[in-house]
């Protein structure tokens, strides 16, 4: 497959083409097809952008109808029919059933735009500049969001100093027996700790890029209480693990919390169309008209597909229950796999349909597995500080047959990657279930 034009004309910054060195030409559901007709099972989902699969036929039909009717495509922040219907649907499907009140702000098209707006707003509301972020957190690669991102690879590329952020230990950072909330509270209580009082805390309930680190529900509850005690806003970055990835539409719902500000993007449009959104408590809406603008805020094509996604999948609990059923299938399979190779140092963590197979003993193992998986026809990536986590991110709509086939291919890839070092697998069948 000839990739020379990409090598010759595209910047060295390109990344995923190096992991998946083929030319993809088609995609449908959970399958990607390259120019030679080879099929790949997608366990990557555009880094969490395609929760409902590629070219979802329900969304595509509605989008084509809208285009054929000459619906408004570009409208800045003007009132359009597509935006009106989206706002009505958010209110009816997401807010009223939860008895929530949020004001919506449409930012630029990517997740980092939503984070930038959230941080700016928090600083305006509180009149303070410092933000608490967390170890292994990822919030984007533009100025303000990059300052809140912990990964050295991204921070080193900034070229300028990144300030006004204090990093604190995420849940479990020091192990399961250390309460990191108590550590943060001690820092906040001590006037000589050197910690400038923050305007807000920004947190992911599951750190996808950071290595599929999962905050416990109790920790999230305690974090919200901490924010309230110390007059800080709580911002939940739900860009990768929101829109149903953990089983509920918002990833924090199981904790019973209600953040002050929520950022959404990635799978919000449902179709891979750029769209980002900030939800804020109404009393926090202190923006002056036009104070945070952008040419591509409010993507009307994305409004169309996002509305359809909410109506199709989130008008009842049925889809949420289905995601949780698939979570159990994947989790059981991964636990079984980890126990099958007791000397490999494999561990499992995750929530919903973001699950990680962690190579605790040899970080490079995860990348070897990912490469072997791609050779066998599975698109999957790694994450974590040392790329030590094989991150499973299939579409929420993936068919069981395709899901189990992909898992079987990953199992074979694990065996390949370990074959030179590990003894034969001790295959365990938990509860008599087939993997």
Curated annotation (Swiss-Prot):
Keywords: Aminotransferase, Pyridoxal phosphate, Transferase. Coiled coil: none annotated. Signal peptide: none annotated. GO terms for molecular function: diaminobutyrate-2-oxoglutarate transaminase activity; diaminobutyrate-pyruvate transaminase activity; pyridoxal phosphate binding. Its EC number is 2.6.1.76. It holds the Pfam family Aminotran_3. The keyword Ion transport does not apply. CDD domains: OAT_like. Its cofactor is pyridoxal 5'-phosphate. The keyword Disulfide bond does not apply. InterPro entries: Aminotrans_3, Aminotrans_3_PPA_site, Dat, Ectoine_EctB, PyrdxlP-dep_Trfase, PyrdxlP-dep_Trfase_major, PyrdxlP-dep_Trfase_small. Pathway: Amine and polyamine biosynthesis; ectoine biosynthesis; L-ectoine from L-aspartate 4-semialdehyde: step 1/3. GO terms for biological process: ectoine biosynthetic process. The modification N6-(pyridoxal phosphate)lysine is found at residue 266. It is an enzyme of class 2 (transferase). Belongs to the class-III pyridoxal-phosphate-dependent aminotransferase family. This is Diaminobutyrate--2-oxoglutarate transaminase. It comes from Bordetella parapertussis (strain 12822 / ATCC BAA-587 / NCTC 13253). The gene is ectB.
